[in-house]
């Protein structure tokens, strides 16, 4: 298990460094970088499935720690996947905005009585304002989606960690009072997470209302 874990852990760090290349890549190479990162992420998910099987076969005294290490890798790669999707969403929105601006600049309007071209400054200004609003909303939605994905992944990790802690507690023979305190803390964490999600949605709604 250890060689595969070290290989996967190294791949996660390599992807983190490659994410910085996305911001500096030109239009011709950005798709190649995205595909390269996505292929590495897919390979890591495949390794994680194998690691989960191997961790369950570890000796009892090392099994819990092995599963926690695998869960941490899964949490890290889920964040990388979310970051990649958000970048792709922003890039596609920017490319669409540029195409629409180019189409508008290449279009001319004429009057019915003559071939006099109508000035387009006001139309361009109005279109630019709309595109800025749309771009701001896209960034906001992408950021909110990233936060919600992070909270969801954290909830899954905490849930798995709680179960493992309870299993360890049972093996060690901890008292019922300690067990109840652990369960109470997990219950409180759940409400904190739900409150954070609701607050995020409320902020997104208010900002969208302000922008429109």
Curated annotation (Swiss-Prot):
Record key words, sorted: Acetylation, Coiled coil, Endoplasmic reticulum, Golgi apparatus, Membrane, Protein transport, Transmembrane, Transmembrane helix, Transport
Locations listed in the record: Golgi apparatus, cis-Golgi network membrane; Golgi apparatus membrane; Endoplasmic reticulum membrane
Cytoplasmic face of the membrane: 1-190
Gene Ontology CC terms: endoplasmic reticulum membrane; ER to Golgi transport vesicle membrane; Golgi apparatus; Golgi membrane; late endosome membrane; SNARE complex
Chief location of this protein within or outside the cell: Golgi
Residues with the N-acetylmethionine modification: 1
Chain ranges for the short sequence motif IxM motif as given in the UniProt record: 118-120
GO biological process, one term: vesicle fusion
Topological domain spans for side Vesicular: 212
Ranges in a coiled coil: 61-107
Membrane-spanning parts: 191-211
A GO molecular-function annotation: SNARE binding
Protein family (similarity comment): Belongs to the GOSR2 family.
Family matches, as PANTHER family: GOLGI SNAP RECEPTOR COMPLEX MEMBER 2, VESICLE TRANSPORT V-SNARE PROTEIN VTI1-RELATED
Oligomer status and interactors: Part of a unique SNARE complex composed of the Golgi SNAREs GOSR1, STX5 and YKT6. Interacts with BET1.
Protein function: Involved in transport of proteins from the cis/medial-Golgi to the trans-Golgi network.
Protein name per Swiss-Prot or TrEMBL: Golgi SNAP receptor complex member 2
Protein species of origin: Rattus norvegicus (Rat)
């Amino acid at each position: 298990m250890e060689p595969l874990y070290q290989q996967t852990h190294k791949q996660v760090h390599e992807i983190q460094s490659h994410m910085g290349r996305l911001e500096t890549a030109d239009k011709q190479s950005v798709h190649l970088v995205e595909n390269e990162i996505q292929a590495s992420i897919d390979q890591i998910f495949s390794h994680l499935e194998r690691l989960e099987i191997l961790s369950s076969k570890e000796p009892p005294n090392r099994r819990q720690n092995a599963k926690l290490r695998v869960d941490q890798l899964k949490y890290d790669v889920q964040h990388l996947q979310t970051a990649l999707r958000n970048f792709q969403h922003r890039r596609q929105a920017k490319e669409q905005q540029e195409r629409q601006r180019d189409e508008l600049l290449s279009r001319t309007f004429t009057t019915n009585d003559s071939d006099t071209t109508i000035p387009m400054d006001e139309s361009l200004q109005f279109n630019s304002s709309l595109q800025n609003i749309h771009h701001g909303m896209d960034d906001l939605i992408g950021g909110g989606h990233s936060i919600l994905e992070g909270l969801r992944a954290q909830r899954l990790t905490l849930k798995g960690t709680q179960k493992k802690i309870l299993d360890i507690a049972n093996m060690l023979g901890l008292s019922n009072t300690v067990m109840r305190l652990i369960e109470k803390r997990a219950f409180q964490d759940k409400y904190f997470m739900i409150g954070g999600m609701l607050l995020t949605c409320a902020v997104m709604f208010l900002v969208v209302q302000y922008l429109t």
